[in-house]
UniProtKB/Swiss-Prot annotation:
<comment type="similarity">
    <text>Belongs to the peptidase A1 family.</text>
</comment>
<feature type="propeptide" description="Activation peptide">
    <location>
        <begin position="17"/>
        <end position="52"/>
    </location>
</feature>
<dbReference type="GO" id="GO:0019886">
    <property type="term" value="P:antigen processing and presentation of exogenous peptide antigen via MHC class II"/>
</dbReference>
<dbReference type="GO" id="GO:0005768">
    <property type="term" value="C:endosome"/>
</dbReference>
<dbReference type="InterPro" id="IPR033121">
    <property type="entry name" value="PEPTIDASE_A1"/>
</dbReference>
<dbReference type="InterPro" id="IPR001461">
    <property type="entry name" value="Aspartic_peptidase_A1"/>
</dbReference>
<feature type="active site">
    <location>
        <position position="92"/>
    </location>
</feature>
<feature type="disulfide bond">
    <location>
        <begin position="105"/>
        <end position="110"/>
    </location>
</feature>
<keyword id="KW-0865">Zymogen</keyword>
<feature type="disulfide bond">
    <location>
        <begin position="310"/>
        <end position="344"/>
    </location>
</feature>
<keyword id="KW-0732">Signal</keyword>
<keyword id="KW-0645">Protease</keyword>
<feature type="signal peptide">
    <location>
        <begin position="1"/>
        <end position="16"/>
    </location>
</feature>
<dbReference type="InterPro" id="IPR021109">
    <property type="entry name" value="Peptidase_aspartic_dom_sf"/>
</dbReference>
<feature type="active site">
    <location>
        <position position="277"/>
    </location>
</feature>
<protein>
    <recommendedName>
        <fullName>Cathepsin E-A</fullName>
        <ecNumber>3.4.23.34</ecNumber>
    </recommendedName>
</protein>
<feature type="disulfide bond">
    <location>
        <begin position="268"/>
        <end position="272"/>
    </location>
</feature>
Length: 397
């Protein structure tokens, strides 16, 4: 009987899944670096590569550090309106709002991306409210609309979303994405908007109130991975999921036991907080810790980045994040990014998030690419397990 129940559960988790393909494309940082503009952008944004502080206080709108999106390479497709208007978005567990550029946006970034035209949608309604999101030293602002949103065949009715009419600076001009679809908790949503996934649950569009993320770190593969709504796919990981309780229902925040270098605890020795964030490509932590970590791995600041010689990766240490008693190892090949020409970028970035939200470590795509991640809203927990790398994919999925 127990085997039958396990098989039934597995069938539900696999065959009731809605799979959203993720494509992998060039990040903003890599594009700017190739153009020789990266250092200029840091200067323009007032960002110190050694120490970046998210200075948003309690009485300000929620802040999204601009550097979080500089290295994002994984994107998916959604549509808004009737008939559907298509957009490329970041599926971001570190925020909770959906926004896309508006046809009324006058910023340079909007002009080079797909823009939503409300007058062409028969199901569009105006909310009448404005919204604003902080990104680094600038803000993205616009109005809130209501319309149908489709994600890989899932039709979400009456979804509130932001229509941006102003986007900050020049950074988003080089972005491969049009907008962002937040998958965080409702408590961090701007404008009292109900997040897309919450509406999926409320409208009975998913089998289970959970979603999961698989990311390929193979630089030679155009296949980025997949976002799965309604459960998880056990063929994408090995072993058992380590279920970790969410400690604060805003971000997908969990307890981090410690951070080890070659088996020695050097950071977070008394335990600290971390978030699992698909909208942040790198692994970030308090700047004082990250400066020390960069020195240990031999990374040095150059060209607006932290770089290491790719030829010495085998001599660099292993970094381990201990979560719920289990060590999640990251080899040098896993925590660095190959830029070409024998140069690799460090996958670590300093980011000081002040109380009460911080301090926080952020386990971004560099980490998620090695560990399949399940986000369970029904039980408020995150599941982690080692990925089974691409290829192969089963049944052509």
């Amino acid at each position: 009987m127990r085997q039958i129940l396990v098989l039934l559960l597995f069938a539900t988790l696999v065959y009731g899944l809605i799979r959203v393909p993720l494509k992998r494309q060039k990040s903003i940082r890599k594009t700017l670096k190739e153009k020789g503009k990266l250092s200029h952008i840091w200067t323009q944004q007032g960002i110190d590569m050694v120490q970046y502080t998210d200075s948003c206080s309690n009485d300000q709108a929620p802040s999204e550090p601009l550097i979080n999106y500089m290295d994002v390479e994984y994107f998916g497709e959604i549509s808004v309106g009737t008939p559907p208007q298509n957009f490329t978005v970041i599926f971001d567990t570190g925020s909770s709002n959906l926004w896309v550029p508006s046809v009324y946006c006058i910023s340079q970034a909007c002009a080079q991306h797909d823009r939503f035209q409300p007058q062409l949608s028969s199901t569009y309604e105006s909310n009448g409210n404005n919204f604003s999101l902080q990104y680094g030293t600038g803000s993205l602002s616009g109005v809130i609309g209501i319309d149908a949103v489709t994600v890989e065949g899932i039709l979400v009715q009456n979804q509130q979303f932001g229509e941006s009419v102003s986007e900050p600076g020049s950074t988003f001009v080089d972005a491969e994405f049009d907008g962002i679809l937040g998958l965080g908790y409702p408590s961090i949503a701007v404008g009292d908007c109900t997040p897309v996934f919450d509406n999926m649950i409320a409208q009975n569009l998913v089998e289970l109130p959970m979603f999961s993320v698989y990311m390929s770190r193979n630089p030679n593969s155009a296949v980025g991975g997949e976002l799965v709504f309604g459960g998880f796919d056990a063929s994408r990981f090995s072993g058992q999921l380590n279920w970790v309780p969410v400690t604060n229902q805003g971000y997908w925040q969990i307890q981090l036991d410690n951070v080890q270098i070659n088996g020695e605890v050097l950071f977070c020795s008394g335990g600290c907080q971390a978030i699992v964030d698909t909208g942040t490509s790198l692994i970030t932590g308090p700047s004082s810790d990250i400066v020390q970590l960069q020195n240990i791995i031999g990374a040095s600041a150059a060209n607006g980045d932290y770089e290491v010689d790719c030829s010495v990766l085998n001599e660099m240490p292993t970094v381990t994040f201990t979560i719920n008693g289990i060590g999640y190892q990251m080899t040098p090949q896993q925590y660095t990014l190959q830029d070409g020409g024998g140069v690799c970028s460090s996958g670590f970035q300093g980011l000081d998030i002040p109380p009460p939200a911080g301090p926080l470590w952020i386990l971004g795509d560099v980490f998620i690419g090695q560990y399949y991640s399940v986000f369970d809203r029904g039980n408020n927990r995150v599941g982690l397990a080692p990925v089974v790398p691409y290829p192969p994919l089963k049944n052509g999925v």
